[in-house]
A protein has these predicted regions:
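Non-catalytic pre-domain segments flanking phosphatase-related domains
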Residues: 2, 10-116, 324
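Electropositive phosphate-/nucleotide-binding environments in soluble metabolic enzymes
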Residues: 36, 82, 122-125, 138, ...
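C-terminal cap/substrate-recognition subdomain and adjoining C-terminal extension
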Residues: 17, 21, 86, 168-169, ...
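Cysteine/selenocysteine-centered motifs that mediate thiol-based redox chemistry or coordinate metal-sulfur cofactors
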Residues: 153-173, 177
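Long, compositionally biased regulatory regions of eukaryotic proteins
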Residues: 2-3, 296
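Active-site neighborhood of HAD-like aspartate-dependent phosphohydrolases
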Residues: 39-42, 106-118, 122-153
Length: 325
């Protein structure tokens, strides 16, 4: 959505027209149910940071989510974006809301591809932890997973360690999990809307192919990159078919997808929560930390921490034009 009507003009009492103020940024405020922060307070904080607030407006949300959040946008002009961003992030953390500061260039960018991590991004669990629980080694694997996602362990080494603990698990546990996946709020609204806008949607996951393929079938993803568990005689061997889909692999896959579609990576967005998502998020034209680990939030200027996946649509310029689901 281009930032049209960037303040316009106003008339003084003697009919002189005030100077036009050009909007440099958009502030997106997403307030989940249970939180309380008025848009006027955000405007006050922006003004205290030296920004001029040109316009504020409410944005419709999908009908299915209308009782779960409110969304506002503020057009602003700011010369000190670093100071403004810091104040807005502090406000976000204090009130448990999502506030994104985006440049005019980012708002005007036409995005063609959206790539998503899967575990704890599209679904509300870590698949390897769920399978470990079924194998009776849940606590042990969950701790290793948490450390790996925080970037405290080498991903490949920790992944092999966790996989080895799954050895002997009945392969039916994977399909059983696929049948009861807990998906993130707003997933269907987001995928339907982005698909209706002609975007290519992809899952790049360090998780497992059967789970990713189930999401692909249910929600219309076009591409899937994930790990293939090695199965022998109906049992998990504790290994995957190489290569492991890790941090570097995801970034390479993003570049390859963009090249195949004949677009630059600046026309891609990447959404993730863990340390193994950071490279693809940094490479993309828009990287979004979604319900992310602290290190990922710290490295990402744009985040959605308290609301659902429909928040991605507001960052892409949606004014409530959500596709029917």
């Amino acid at each position: 959505m281009p930032l049209s009507g960037e303040g316009g003009t106003s008339s003084s009492p003697n009919n002189q027209r005030a100077p036009v103020v050009n909007a440099t940024h958009m502030i997106v405020l997403m307030v989940p149910r249970g939180a309380a922060l008025e848009v006027d307070r955000v405007a006050e904080v922006a003004q205290a940071a030296g920004a001029e607030v040109i316009e504020t407006r409410a944005v419709p949300v999908p009908v299915a989510l209308s009782d779960r959040r409110t969304v506002h946008k503020l057009l602003v002009s700011s010369a000190d974006t670093e100071g403004l961003s810091s104040k807005l992030r502090n406000l976000s953390d204090q009130h448990g809301v999502d506030i994104a500061l985006q440049s005019r260039a980012a708002r005007c960018q036409s995005y063609r591809v959206a790539v998503f991590d899967m575990d704890s991004t599209l679904i509300d669990c870590e698949v390897i932890d769920e399978l470990a629980a079924a194998a009776g080694v849940g606590e042990q694997v969950a701790e290793i997973t948490a450390q790996a996602m925080r970037g405290e362990l080498d991903f490949d080494e920790s992944y092999r360690t966790r996989l080895a603990l799954l050895k002997g698990l009945d392969a039916s546990a994977i399909e059983n999990l696929a049948d009861r996946l807990p998906v993130k709020e707003g997933l269907r609204e987001m995928t339907a809307t982005l698909k209706a806008q002609g975007m290519t949607l992809a899952i790049f996951s360090g998780g497992f192919m059967p789970i990713a393929e189930r999401l692909q079938a249910d929600y219309g993803f076009d591409e899937v990159v994930a790990n293939t568990l090695e199965i022998e005689s109906g049992k998990v061997t504790g290994r995957v078919v190489p290569p492991i889909v890790n941090r570097e692999h995801k970034a390479v896959a993003l570049h390859a997808l963009a090249t195949r579609l004949g677009i630059g990576v600046d026309a891609c967005i990447a959404v993730g929560d863990g340390a193994n998502d950071l490279d693809m998020m940094a490479m993309a034209g828009l990287g979004v930390a979604f319900h992310a680990k602290p290190a990922v939030r710290a490295a990402s200027p744009i985040e959605v921490t308290h609301c659902g996946l429909d928040g991605v649509c507001y960052l892409l310029g949606s004014e409530g034009e959500f596709a029917d689901t």
